[in-house]
Design a protein with these regions (language model features):
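Sec-dependent signal peptide recognition
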Residues: 2-10
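Residue-level marker of positions within ordered structural domains that often coincide
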Residues: 10, 70, 83, 87, ...
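Phosphate-group recognition and catalysis centered on beta-loop-alpha active-site segments
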Residues: 20-29, 107, 111-374
Length: 374
């Protein structure tokens, strides 16, 4: 995805004045002047220097660089480091000594190296010994806005193993975290995610516990970089564009750390057509579902068993084939660990589950950590 945006409207206004120009664009750009980057592919956090070719400082009255990530500079040859992997359009707005204003552009691809097992085990590797793990539903939303960077950070701080996040696409094809189709309930804005631009969504603030915060809706890349190397990610896609989601996960170097929730065999097939090694995470309701996904996915590591599939024959077949069980425990539930004295956690244990997704991640982690698995 090519970006030339400001993260939110306030930054847009500040960036405009930071370059000290209120000129409007002039005619066609001079054929001889060009923007050059010291590297057009660069790792996140690494510096890249931008220069104007075939022109001297004496030929220029001023220059404003827009790096495409909300940051700007008025230096003649600035250096910049990107913190989020993505593809960025860098724009140099140049006021020539003649008074003409021209725009020159270049593209920079920012990436992160794939996390290997020496940094953090892959999801299949982490499931191999079948120790109990906990997944924070929509992040740790009891202490931060759901589907937010701070909710991810809170889960990490509390030693939670997984987070579940929901991904949707904006009108201009950017991927953001949002469970509902609209932003009405979780931000101070209104409208469908699919009808709003990324910049529009970024101009609103997330709610927490009925109060407006200073936190914005994160992009998928921002969320992944917050999680990178610290917590596993279950991506629940509310869209069918698996390719776009996969590309961002790969660019963030998080393929081994993420699993992609699928509900249909065709969705799993679409993912595997992109990358046969991707961590497919099916939701299973019946034995036919399990059989279908097992025949399609080589070395299926984990499935989510809907409560309809909590049957001995289904579970035993999965477990005997080395498949770990993921189950919901106190998710969108009137019961809590306190009101039912952890009975639903005990049911999860008796069913042989490995990963418990919950709205009470800290409570379940403490409880399960005190149990020894047979």
């Amino acid at each position: 995805m090519i970006k030339a945006f400001k993260f939110f409207m306030l930054v847009s206004v500040m960036s405009f004045y930071a370059c000290g120009s209120d000129s409007i664009e002039g005619g066609a750009a001079s054929a001889s002047i060009a923007v050059e980057a010291s590297a057009n592919e660069v790792g996140y956090g690494e510096g890249v220097t931008f220069t104007l070719q075939n022109v001297t400082e004496s030929d220029i009255a001023s220059v404003c660089w827009d790096f495409g990530d909300g940051e700007t500079s008025d230096a003649f040859a600035p250096s910049h480091a990107y913190r989020i992997p993505d593809d960025y359009t860098v724009v140099a707005s140049v006021t020539l000594s003649t008074g003409e204003v021209k725009e020159y552009k270049t593209l920079v691809k920012v990436f992160a190296e794939e996390i290997n097992s020496t940094v953090r085990l892959s999801i299949p590797e982490s499931l191999a010994d079948r120790h109990y793990q906990v997944c924070a539903h929509r992040g740790y939303w009891k202490e931060a806005p759901e589907n937010s960077v701070s909710a991810i950070e809170k889960a990490i701080q509390n030693g939670i193993d997984f987070i579940e996040i929901d991904v949707r696409m904006t009108e201009d094809n950017e991927l953001v975290l949002m469970h509902n189709a609209t932003i009405d309930e979780t931000t101070n804005g209104t409208g469908k995610v699919s009808d709003l631009t990324f910049e529009e969504i970024k101009s609103y603030y997330l709610y927490f516990d009925g109060r407006q915060t200073m936190e914005h809706v994160p992009s998928l890349a921002e969320a992944l970089m917050a999680a990178r190397g610290k917590i596993y990610v279950d991506i629940d896609m509310k869209i069918s564009d698996y390719r776009s989601v996969y590309n961002i996960v790969k660019q963030c170097g998080m393929l081994s750390q993420c699993m992609f929730t699928v509900y249909e065999l065709q969705d799993a097939s679409n993912l595997l057509n992109i990358d046969k090694t991707v961590n497919v995470f099916p939701v299973v309701y019946t034995m036919d579902d399990l059989d279908g996904f097992m025949s399609l996915v080589d070395k299926l590591a984990i499935v989510q068993f809907n409560s309809e599939a909590w049957k001995n024959d289904i579970l035993e077949k999965a477990y005997s084939n080395g498949i770990a069980g993921f189950m919901n425990v106190y998710v969108n539930d009137d019961d809590t660990p306190y009101t039912d004295n952890y009975q639903k956690v005990n049911r999860f244990v008796s069913l042989g589950g490995t990963v418990a997704q919950t709205d009470f991640p800290v409570e379940l982690k403490i409880y399960l950590d005190n149990l020894k698995r047979d």
